[in-house]
């Protein structure tokens, strides 16, 4: 597995934060690093496999990667990222208690992926721009200024995450997409889902298409197929059982959609034939 080292990314041996834009981010094999990372998805779509679990990501997704996590990107479509790298909680001179603003693992579950709305994403861009142009002076005021900007970024993300319960349409769509991640295998009635999240059906269709480039049903199918591919690689369940577990009522239809999406059959994935080009 590829290991990325801080010496190759941080501007100096003492700098606690670095900015790495990926415009766009191509598919990238599994890796980990000796630093922490906040991944901010500007726009586009892709699959982020995080510690073996696949997540669909799009504009407004924010992922918090720790120094012991492993991840990769695949199936990317104009995926543009800004990576905010930071060494460790004890690398800062003026900041303490950062863990209170970051996602925390509880009972083995780490809420690594958050979502923010487009207006917040614009504020994030402005803050990151200030961080990029803050200079590399090592006198106390310069260092403090850079650390303050990083703290402002964490506060903005924390306040704007799903946990803060914003009520505009962007936030409602983010909540809906998070709900689909957990309920993808269920039968989904879009009218009922729209009502559940206080969106009109028309707004749901329009906003999901703007965020992901996909219609709601196409987005749900892709989500199901991504989860199915993960099970094909990492479980002993039969293809038919996996199809049903992932919300498909007919295994033949599942196989047709799977091949159309990934250019491999479920059996090919089960046998590892795609690994040659990973």
Swiss-Prot record:
One of its GO terms (molecular function) is sequence-specific DNA binding. It is found in: Cytoplasm. Keywords: Activator, Cytoplasm, DNA-binding, Repeat, Rhamnose metabolism, Transcription, Transcription regulation. Residues 174-272 form the HTH araC/xylS-type domain. Pfam families: AraC_binding (PF02311), HTH_18 (PF12833). CDD domains: cupin_RhaR_RhaS-like_N. GO terms for biological process: positive regulation of DNA-templated transcription; rhamnose metabolic process. The keyword Transcription applies. Binds DNA as a dimer. Activates expression of the rhaBAD and rhaT operons. This is HTH-type transcriptional activator RhaS. It comes from Salmonella paratyphi A (strain AKU_12601).
